[in-house]
């Protein structure tokens, strides 16, 4: 069995199919890992969800911020943005099974056999892998509970609190956990988030740095596959870390990683650009 991890799809199905064909992916025996942001801004969000749902037994995916945004819009907790390409999903006759599958995806997946973690944005430097798994489970439980889901989606948006505190409770607690796993790029050594800066490593505000760069990071030595940060262009120069968002939706490329061998393949995505790219890399 081969395990392949792929960076942010964002509704770009054709490049994914291109990569899977190149490795002769067989859903009967192989596994596809996805770092989240399955939908939005690309031209094939509905087709992408349908493709993944059809082979869901062979797919392991975590949730990204765009996936959570889709759930919020679907539950009327948020409005569609001008740049969203989600309307086809919302109007699809099969939207309910697709959205139900989506909300049951985890924020963090850990493969015990390979000792590899899969997340969308990252793990804050002050958390061990064990604590990260426990915190992710708190949000996952809210997403999967019919009564708690609307309350979570209503309160999910926002940049505060900017830092974890074990005394946090309710929606504030869930919001900061969600922001760590799905929106984080820069933070302080003790985990205070800056969610405004979205470009390359040299654009960190004073006192902030990429979440993975701190010598004291408690997941140092762990293998972590993540996406979200297209400006990294697939490089973070940290042993054991694999950055897979290579900006497909913005006209760059989609990247596939053989989890066992470390080999990477990329597919050009120049034709996938749906809206014009803004001046800054998107959240």
Curated annotation (Swiss-Prot):
<dbReference type="GO" id="GO:0005737">
    <property type="term" value="C:cytoplasm"/>
</dbReference>
<protein>
    <recommendedName>
        <fullName>Bis(5'-nucleosyl)-tetraphosphatase, symmetrical</fullName>
        <ecNumber>3.6.1.41</ecNumber>
    </recommendedName>
</protein>
<keyword id="KW-0378">Hydrolase</keyword>
<dbReference type="InterPro" id="IPR029052">
    <property type="entry name" value="Metallo-depent_PP-like"/>
</dbReference>
<dbReference type="InterPro" id="IPR004617">
    <property type="entry name" value="ApaH"/>
</dbReference>
<dbReference type="GO" id="GO:0008803">
    <property type="term" value="F:bis(5'-nucleosyl)-tetraphosphatase (symmetrical) activity"/>
</dbReference>
<comment type="similarity">
    <text>Belongs to the Ap4A hydrolase family.</text>
</comment>
<dbReference type="Pfam" id="PF00149">
    <property type="entry name" value="Metallophos"/>
</dbReference>
<dbReference type="GO" id="GO:0016791">
    <property type="term" value="F:phosphatase activity"/>
</dbReference>
<comment type="function">
    <text>Hydrolyzes diadenosine 5',5'''-P1,P4-tetraphosphate to yield ADP.</text>
</comment>
<dbReference type="GO" id="GO:0110154">
    <property type="term" value="P:RNA decapping"/>
</dbReference>
<dbReference type="InterPro" id="IPR004843">
    <property type="entry name" value="Calcineurin-like_PHP_ApaH"/>
</dbReference>
């Amino acid at each position: 069995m081969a395990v392949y991890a792929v960076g942010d799809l964002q509704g770009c199905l054709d490049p994914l199919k291109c990569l899977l064909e190149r490795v002769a992916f067989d859903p009967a025996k192989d596994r596809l890992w996805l770092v989240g942001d399955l939908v939005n801004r690309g031209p094939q969000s509905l087709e992408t969800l349908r493709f993944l749902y059809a082979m869901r037994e062979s797919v392991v995916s975590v949730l990204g911020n765009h996936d959570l945004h889709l759930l919020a819009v679907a539950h009327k907790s948020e409005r569609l943005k001008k740049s969203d390409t989600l309307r086809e999903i919302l109007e699809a006759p099969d939207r309910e099974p697709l959205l139900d599958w989506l909300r049951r995806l985890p924020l963090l997946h850990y493969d015990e056999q390979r000792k590899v973690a899969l997340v969308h944005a990252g793990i804050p430097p002050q958390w061990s892998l064990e604590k990260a798994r426990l915190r992710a489970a708190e949000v996952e439980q809210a997403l999967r509970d019919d009564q708690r889901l609307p309350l979570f989606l209503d309160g999910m948006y926002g940049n505060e609190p900017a830092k974890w505190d074990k005394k946090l409770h309710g929606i504030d607690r869930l919001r900061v956990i969600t922001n760590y796993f799905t929106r984080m790029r820069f933070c302080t050594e003790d985990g205070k988030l800056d969610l405004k800066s979205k470009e390359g490593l040299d654009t960190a505000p004073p006192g902030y740095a990429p979440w993975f760069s701190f010598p004291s990071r408690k997941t140092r030595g762990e293998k972590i596959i993540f996406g979200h940060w297209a400006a990294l262009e697939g490089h973070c120069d940290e042993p054991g870390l694999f950055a897979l968002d290579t900006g497909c939706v913005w006209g760059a490329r989609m990247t596939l990683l053989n989890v066992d061998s470390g080999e990477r393949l990329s597919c050009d995505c120049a034709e996938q650009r749906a809206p014009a790219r803004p001046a800054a890399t998107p959240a």
